[in-house]
């Protein structure tokens, strides 16, 4: 069964479905690393770039992993492996369910589906709200444009609108 489009899971209603001890067969999240780069130098770097969400919604675990790969690869090739610290600030706790349906020609004659069907677990997602910081990059002064471009590439992997905020140490957001 192929992966459904992100629009099927972007918006949510109701409480999060997170109690894994009661849920059987939850697939593990694709994203396993949440911190990359040089953590020891984080306290010395002057700028911090943040990707802030503008709407409430869900970001699937494979979108988080795609954004992680895109941001990390761009920063490692442009400013070097040891010249940044990158962190993902959300975790995909919410379990996504899907009521599997047959999707071929003539399937409508074979099934009617079921109203309010509960579905089986197919993945996980992180729930975000307006103002939630999803990605965070620390770097040296002078690398602002590279940090902005990396966060822009990461934002393109998410189904929700977002804003890039660059902060300098000891100053307000710009």
From Swiss-Prot:
Q: Which Gene Ontology CC terms are recorded?
A: ribonucleoprotein complex; ribosome
Give the GO molecular function terms: structural constituent of ribosome
Q: Tell me, which GO biological process terms does this entry list?
A: translation
Does the keyword DNA damage feature in the UniProt annotation? no
Q: What keywords appear on the UniProt entry? A: Ribonucleoprotein, Ribosomal protein
Check the record and name the Pfam families matching this protein: Ribosomal_L16 (PF00252)
Q: Which InterPro entries match?
A: Ribosomal_uL16 (IPR047873), Ribosomal_uL16_arc (IPR022981), Ribosomal_uL16_CS_euk_arc (IPR018255), Ribosomal_uL16_dom (IPR016180), Ribosomal_uL16_euk_arch (IPR001197), Ribosomal_uL16_sf (IPR036920)
- Supply the name of the protein: Large ribosomal subunit protein uL16
The source organism is Aeropyrum pernix (strain ATCC 700893 / DSM 11879 / JCM 9820 / NBRC 100138 / K1)
What gene is this protein translated from?
rpl10e
């Amino acid at each position: 069964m192929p992966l459904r489009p992100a629009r099927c899971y972007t918006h949510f209603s109701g409480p999060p479905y997170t109690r894994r001890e009661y849920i059987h067969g939850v697939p593990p999240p694709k994203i396993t690393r949440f911190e990359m780069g040089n953590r020891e130098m984080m306290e010395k770097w002057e700028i911090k770039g943040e990707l802030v969400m503008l709407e409430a919604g869900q970001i699937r675990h494979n979108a988080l992993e795609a954004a992680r790969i895109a941001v990390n690869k761009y920063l490692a090739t442009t400013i070097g492996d040891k010249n940044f610290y990158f962190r993902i600030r959300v975790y995909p706790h919410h379990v996504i369910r899907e009521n599997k349906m047959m999707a071929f020609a003539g399937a409508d004659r074979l099934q009617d589906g079921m109203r309010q069907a509960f579905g089986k677990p197919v993945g996980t997602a992180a729930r975000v709200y307006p103002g939630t910081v999803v990605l965070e990059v620390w770097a040296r002064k002078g690398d602002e444009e590279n940090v902005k471009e990396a966060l822009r590439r990461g934002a393109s992997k998410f189904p929700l609108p977002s804003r890039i905020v660059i902060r300098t140490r000891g100053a307000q957001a710009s």
